[in-house]
Amino acid sequence: QAQAMIAAGHAIVVDVRDAPEVEKSGKVSGAVHVSRGMLEFRADPDSPYHDKSFHKDRPVIVYCASGGRSALAGKTLKDLGYTEVYNLGAFKDWVENGGGVDRPIEPGM
């Protein structure tokens, strides 16, 4: 279901891992990187740091390395008023199931 939503472009996909994790392994193709510690600032429309990719009427799919941080992120988003929130779970599971990945840029490029 997540792959279909992502392919259709209906959902925003959010990687809540820390920057070094994303730099090392890449991220789900088309995902927005917002570390778990910054999520409230980026997802709250009243925040001066709001990321305009977040819309409360748009489905949000969150993931992390193992599924723990993304579960917490999902709860946070629901507390902020997002109604369609999905936990994709672990990034490694996405990769192992053939999901698309945007690879990191080589250092120095």
Show which residues each predicted segment covers.
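Short, surface-exposed ligand- or partner-binding patches at beta-edge/loop junctions that are enriched
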Residues: 63
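Rhodanese-like catalytic fold shared by cysteine-dependent sulfurtransferases
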Residues: 1-11, 20-59, 68-109
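Structural scaffold elements adjacent to functional motifs in cytosolic proteins
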Residues: 13-15
